[in-house]
């Protein structure tokens, strides 16, 4: 209803101003600005919906100020360009319409009415309401009743008798199991769901809407609200350190806790969270690659679900035979947005909807088959009678190729329980949320029926039943939940440990690199993660007088304030204000101690603008002074005009990447010498080793042969045509996820370059 009202007010404002207001520059500018704000708000809502599937939620506050990288980002580029072009066209059309009768005399009354209607359209828009509520949640002091509802359970389960298998299905919401809406999509797992305790109304709340947040909510009974962006939690050293979570209780009760997934454990800090709360045995992509049957059988995120669940079954067998009380948690990944992945062993590889194949539905159908196979193995085993199996979605599906069909249904998270000791078949329609999952499991295992804000759905009353406005209530509790981190409010001294790549201050520890915004009563950490912008881009968003401490590789800050460190990959500390003074210190000891030293200086806006502009220079446009191309730092020597076909810098150098160009091309600003030696320090990847690699300058071609280890080769070139471009052609680029950023499409690697140097020969 509010959408229709806001649009009607918008349309009325446009028509009244265009046909009645007449000519007046001030009123035109004011009305266009407010109407433009309406357009921007609604496009923001549309774009947020596209990425999150849930409008402008808590995570969008970070998306607006950080670049979006991660899984399938390339698939979002075209829609993003479309939004920008559409916005430009709408503004142009809006300005043209409003000035249709600019030659008519100005009418104050109609101008005022048009402006008021425009303001009303903004106020009535859902986007404005969502943003207002989010901003309020950032500035509240908390809610006084939080302490009354947040309850810590007993730290142990008296006389535990059951083992626990807990399966998180990535984005595998209960909506997929509606056989009327999606016929025969989930027959195998759906049949198992119907054999157990099926909780049909598990809603998603703020702070529970992405994987690590869903895990925290289900195991600790609280949303993941933190003094930093949730997926950046990989940088912290402990996770809600004061809270009692399900894993803590299990460990205290004699359980050995295991977690198995196909992706890297460091992503979003899952390893930190689990280690902080009772899990001593963690297996991710790095740990599994030496034990799986085919270490090369991977998708963009890690190992496929069939591989992961096979390893989980092996672990279940091993632990069951040992007689040790255990919990085994596992997380699938094949149903990750935007498209999902199809395991090669499942029978259900294709699902058609609306008369055409749908990749997301196909991934769901395949993944549920793999999960069902795993569960049926457990059910057929002699240990099932001592086991509780839990299946839940980590969160609702985000914007995938099935999302528009899901949105037509009443959407809920998946949560069902299969008890080997006491088979129960029932569908429970009680209102509940993800925070109730851990409390329900704890209750079944013989512990308390409450956990944080969660309550057992078998013997307690969910917050979703107590509060009709539970989403708003959850946001009201946000400051109280953030305070549970016990995060420091000041930073005066700090210590950098180079062996551990950590920074410590005021009792808190963070992984490097790290950016901190420091004010009188608040320290805001801004870590670097797969889903956030590089720290220098985040720093560029700081206000001129914001105090910062930035710990990163020296070359990243050298172009601004320490050019002598432009080629250094050591750690450096920079602090100051973008509009004031900045200092850069080289971390030259294994354990390095520093102090904050912010000065109240006069702000220079020209200096501020220069710093911001420099911080925003993209990596490939950075230039440094050197007599060779050093590949383990960003940018290129000043003599290089442009380059292509080269991947990002890594600690040792850079790979060629055929996804960015079939050839490595380095174009210099001036012609290369008439006679020169080309000194190449490099290695080959995979089948490119021991193969002739063409290297061309103008019409002349030499051959380079590399092995899998780094070597230095000198090639002799004559350049009679004054060519200015060096071309290297890897013979057989290999598609691989090795060394890739989690969630990115595979790179096609050919040669790994450490250094290339042009040395002019006499004569």
Swiss-Prot record:
The keyword Transmembrane applies. It is a multi-pass membrane protein. Pfam families: DUF7024, Sulfatase. Its EC number is 2.7.8.20. GO terms for biological process: glucan biosynthetic process. The keyword Cell inner membrane applies. One of its GO terms (cellular component) is plasma membrane. Keywords: Cell inner membrane, Cell membrane, Membrane, Transferase, Transmembrane, Transmembrane helix. It is found in: Cell inner membrane. Pathway: Glycan metabolism; osmoregulated periplasmic glucan (OPG) biosynthesis. GO terms for molecular function: phosphatidylglycerol-membrane-oligosaccharide glycerophosphotransferase activity. It catalyses: a phosphatidylglycerol + a membrane-derived-oligosaccharide D-glucose = a 1,2-diacyl-sn-glycerol + a membrane-derived-oligosaccharide 6-(glycerophospho)-D-glucose. The chain crosses the membrane at residues 1-21, 26-46, 77-97, 108-128. Transfers a phosphoglycerol residue from phosphatidylglycerol to the membrane-bound nascent glucan backbones. Belongs to the OpgB family. PANTHER family: LIPOTEICHOIC ACID SYNTHASE, PHOSPHOGLYCEROL TRANSFERASE I. This is Phosphoglycerol transferase I.
């Amino acid at each position: 209803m509010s959408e229709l009202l806001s649009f009607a007010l918008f349309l009325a404002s446009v028509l009244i101003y265009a046909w009645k207001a007449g000519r007046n520059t001030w009123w035109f500018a004011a009305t266009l600005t407010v109407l433009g704000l309406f357009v921007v708000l609604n496009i923001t809502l549309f774009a947020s919906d596209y990425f999150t599937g849930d409008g402008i939620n808590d995570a969008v506050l970070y998306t607006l100020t950080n670049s979006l990288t991660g899984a399938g980002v390339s698939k979002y580029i075209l829609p993003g360009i479309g939004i920008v072009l559409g916005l430009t066209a709408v503004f142009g059309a809006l300005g043209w319409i409003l000035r249709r009768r600019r030659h008519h005399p100005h009418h104050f009354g109609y101008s005022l009415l048009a402006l008021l209607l425009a303001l009303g359209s903004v106020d009535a828009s859902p986007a404005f309401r969502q943003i207002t509520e989010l901003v309020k949640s950032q500035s509240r002091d908390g809610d006084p009743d939080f302490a009354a509802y947040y309850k810590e359970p007993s730290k142990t389960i008296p006389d535990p008798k059951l083992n626990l298998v807990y399966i998180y299905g990535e984005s595998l919401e209960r909506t997929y199991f509606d056989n009327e809406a999606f016929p025969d999509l989930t027959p195998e797992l759906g049949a198992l769901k119907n054999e157990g305790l099926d909780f049909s109304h598990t809603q998603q709340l703020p702070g529970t809407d992405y994987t690590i947040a869903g895990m925290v909510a289900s195991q600790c009974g609280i949303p993941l609200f933190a003094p930093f962006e949730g997926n950046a939690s990989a940088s912290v050293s402990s996770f809600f350190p004061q809270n009692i979570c399900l894993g803590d209780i299990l460990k205290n009760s004699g359980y050995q806790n295991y977690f198995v997934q196909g992706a890297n454990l460091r992503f979003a800090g899952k390893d930190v969270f689990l280690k902080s709360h009772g899990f001593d045995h963690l297996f991710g992509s790095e740990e599994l690659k030496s034990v799986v049957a085919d270490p090369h059988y991977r998708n963009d995120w890690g190992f496929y679900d069939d591989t992961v669940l096979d390893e989980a079954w092996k672990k279940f067998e091993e632990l069951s035979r040992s007689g040790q009380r255990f919990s085994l948690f596992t997380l699938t990944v094949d149903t990750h947005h935007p498209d999902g992945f199809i395991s090669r062993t499942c029978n259900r590889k294709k699902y058609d909807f609306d008369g055409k194949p749908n990749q997301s539905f196909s991934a769901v159908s395949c993944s549920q088959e793999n999960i069902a196979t795993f569960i049926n193995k457990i059910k057929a085993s002699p240990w099932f009678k001592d086991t509780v199996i839990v299946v839940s979605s980590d969160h609702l599906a985000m914007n995938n190729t099935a999302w528009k069909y899901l949105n037509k249904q009443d959407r809920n998270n998946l949560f069902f329980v299969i008890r080997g000791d006491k088979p129960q078949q029932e569908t429970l329609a009680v209102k509940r949320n993800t925070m109730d999952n851990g409390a329900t499991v704890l209750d079944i295992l013989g512990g308390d029926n409450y956990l944080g804000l969660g309550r057992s759905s078998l013997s307690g009353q969910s917050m979703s039943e107590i509060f009709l406005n539970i989403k708003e209530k959850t946001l009201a509790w946000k400051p109280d939940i953030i305070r549970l981190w016990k995060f420091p409010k000041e930073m005066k001294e700090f210590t950098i440990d180079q062996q551990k790549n950590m920074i410590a201050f005021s009792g808190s520890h963070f992984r490097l690199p790290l950016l901190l915004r420091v004010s009188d009563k608040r320290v805001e950490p801004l870590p670097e993660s797969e889903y956030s912008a590089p720290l220098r881009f985040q720093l560029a968003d700081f206000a001129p007088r914001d105090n910062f401490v930035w710990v990163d590789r020296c070359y990243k800050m050298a172009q601004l304030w320490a050019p002598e460190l432009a080629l250094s990959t050591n750690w450096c500390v920079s602090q100051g204000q973008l509009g004031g003074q900045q200092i850069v210190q080289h971390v030259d000891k294994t354990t390095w101690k520093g102090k904050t030293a912010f000065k109240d200086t006069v702000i220079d806006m020209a200096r501020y603008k220069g710093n911001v502009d420099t911080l925003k220079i993209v990596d490939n446009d950075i230039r440094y002074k050197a007599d060779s191309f050093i590949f383990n730092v960003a940018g290129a020597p000043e003599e290089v005009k442009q380059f292509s076909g080269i991947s990002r810098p890594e600690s040792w150098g850079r790979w060629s990447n055929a996804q960015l160009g079939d050839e490595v091309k380095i174009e210099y600003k001036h012609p290369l010498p008439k006679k020169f030696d080309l000194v190449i320090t490099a290695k080959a990847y995979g089948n490119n080793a021991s193969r002739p690699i063409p290297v061309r300058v103008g019409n002349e071609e030499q051959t380079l042969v590399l092995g899998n280890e780094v070597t230095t080769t000198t090639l002799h070139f004559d350049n009679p045509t004054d060519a200015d471009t060096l071309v290297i052609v890897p013979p057989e680029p290999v598609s691989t996820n090795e060394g890739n950023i989690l969630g990115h499409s595979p790179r096609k690697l050919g040669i790994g370059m450490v250094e290339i140097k042009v040395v002019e020969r006499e004569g």
